[in-house]
Amino acid sequence: MNKLIQSKLELLPTSPGCYIHKDKNDTIIYVGKAKNLRNRVRSYFRGSHDTKTEALVSEIEDFEFIVTESNIEALLLEINLIKENQPKYNIMLKDDKSYPFIKITNETYPRLIITRQVKKDVGLYFGPYPDVGAANEIKRLLDRLFPFRKCTNPPEKVCFYYHLGQCKAHTICKVDSQYFKELAQEVAAFLKGQDDQIIEDLRGKMAGAAQAMEFEKAAEYRDLIQSIGTLRTKQRVMAKDLQNRDVFGYYVDKGWMCVQVFFVRQGKLIERDVNLFPYYNDPDEDFLTYIGQFYQEKSHLKPNEILIPADIDEEAVRAMVDTKVLKPQRGEKKQLVNLAIKNARVSLQQKFDLLEKSIEKTQGAIENLGQLLNIPTPVRIESFDNSNIMGTSPVSAMVVFVNGKPSKKDYRKYKIKTVVGPDDYASMREVIKRRYSRVIRDGLTPPDLIVIDGGQGQVNIAKEVIQEQLGLDIPIAGLQKNDKHQTHELLFGDPLQVVELSRNSQEFFLLQRIQDEVHRFAITFHRQLRSKNSFSSQLDGIEGLGPKRKQNLMKHFKSLTKIKEASVDQIVEVGVPRAVAEAVREKLNPKTQEQEQAQLREVAEPQIGLE
């Protein structure tokens, strides 16, 4: 068991869900389900196992998990993931066996049947159910509640089910077909979870039977009510409409955002994409940007339908992706969005927990890092990163780690002074020169290692300044990210080369934490500066709105977007005079020329009233 797995095992939730084992090539080799993820996944790495399980465990290099709301959801999600990924150790479930649905047939006198094939006909399908036994149990309950016809070919006289009260014998008793249409609607409502009225009716019948001292009949009604209760678990991982849809959820904390995307294909949740990154603006704005990039830069195919959380502007998403976008308020789709949000929260918390645990093991990490780079143990590490958007408000930041732990009192922020436009190399040159000129001038303690968040170009710029211009002898390394913005490669040496570094080692975790921290610190500073500049510039020139009132507005509303959406009364509540509040509204929401002309026409037109 490697150190990555060891750390992640300690952070597993006790929720039900699916776990996904991966090998050294990041290939899925096994998918399993669990009532308790923590207990089940830990069991693989404890005690002895049979030969097959030992072979599986020997190949596991990493694992992921997806939290579900129930054991049934975990089971159905497992089915979908196995069919989609065909893991080598899931031999038992690799076949394309279909799972049962309950169907209301589209006939004049409809029937309730169990089928394994979902066709694009006008029948109503409900399920799937984990096995035919579960489907039969529900159908038996429906047969007792709703008297649909049972026979494929109508008999010449009433059948056994008629005497049980489970069939109306429509051909003999001349039952109107409209009755069955209404009955089908009741069954559909029941199978969608709308069963409160049915339970209320059964309770009334049970009370009536008990009052009439028909205790056997009352017991039957009681059993029916209990049976309905046991079937109220609603699963969300498989839908009935066979639609292809992407389900988005996100969660933010401590300056980081996690976005989870569930891919539902042919009604089945088959895969998920998870990404964690620092966010720049309001969370909802950066989430919108992520969705746009998701379908452009990552070349994902657009589905028939996209589901998003309730606080996101669906019109903005629709304009970017040009497909159907929904913000579900209730039902199965809403539950899918909630599940994506829940998994985003779990993933983000796991990242924070892993970082905290890595702090406990840093002394060995810095010693190993020194040996790996053939330098003295880097007790003090200084790391740099730049941040700008299209060249606006360019900044840089430095974080310091001492003995493998962040020394926040030594962190520094830099506004770029000499660079115009988005020039990352020139920005790095300026900041490195400013920092280490001061180290020389003020006699400060130099670092044992400089880590640049960037590739070969940025590292060579830093080397040129440190070694050639300032004459310092400080080792310099670079950290490159992959396309998912994750720590990928360590660059070091002269000439620069990729250093072989196990992704499961403590020194890799240390470098990852340093890179994440400097990136977070730079982005936070950039966001604050850009927000301050934007806020100040848009509110400048409003008579009666001084620095104190601007500060109060920002503290209360958090962003310009929220101030734009606020009413005059809401702005007044912050302590701004009404006349000034009206000026703020007018400045942030200027009328278009068409609106002004329409208002002038309205004033000019004579008003006609009734006397």
UniProtKB/Swiss-Prot annotation:
- Cell wall biogenesis/degradation as a keyword? no
Q: Which UniProt keywords apply?
A: Cytoplasm, DNA damage, DNA excision, DNA repair, Excision nuclease, SOS response
In this protein, which residues make up the domain named GIY-YIG?
Answer: 14-91
Q: Which NCBIfam families match?
A: uvrC
Kindly list the places in or outside the cell where this protein is found, as annotated in its UniProt entry: Cytoplasm
Q: Which cysteines are joined by disulfide bonds?
A: none
Which InterPro entries does the record match to this protein?
A: GIY-YIG_endonuc (IPR000305), GIY-YIG_endonuc_sf (IPR035901), GIY-YIG_UvrC_Cho (IPR047296), RuvA_2-like (IPR010994), UVR_dom (IPR001943), UVR_dom_sf (IPR036876), UvrABC_protein_C (IPR050066), UvrC (IPR004791)
Instruction: Summarize the protein's role.
Output: The UvrABC repair system catalyzes the recognition and processing of DNA lesions. UvrC both incises the 5' and 3' sides of the lesion. The N-terminal half is responsible for the 3' incision and the C-terminal half is responsible for the 5' incision.
Q: GO cellular component terms?
A: cytoplasm; excinuclease repair complex
Which BP terms does GO give this entry?
A: nucleotide-excision repair; SOS response
Give me the ranges of the annotated region Disordered: 587-611
**Can you tell me which family this protein belongs to?**
Belongs to the UvrC family.
Q: What is the designated name of this protein?
A: UvrABC system protein C
Q: Which PROSITE patterns match?
A: GIY_YIG (PS50164), UVR (PS50151), UVRC (PS50165)
Superkingdom of origin: Bacteria
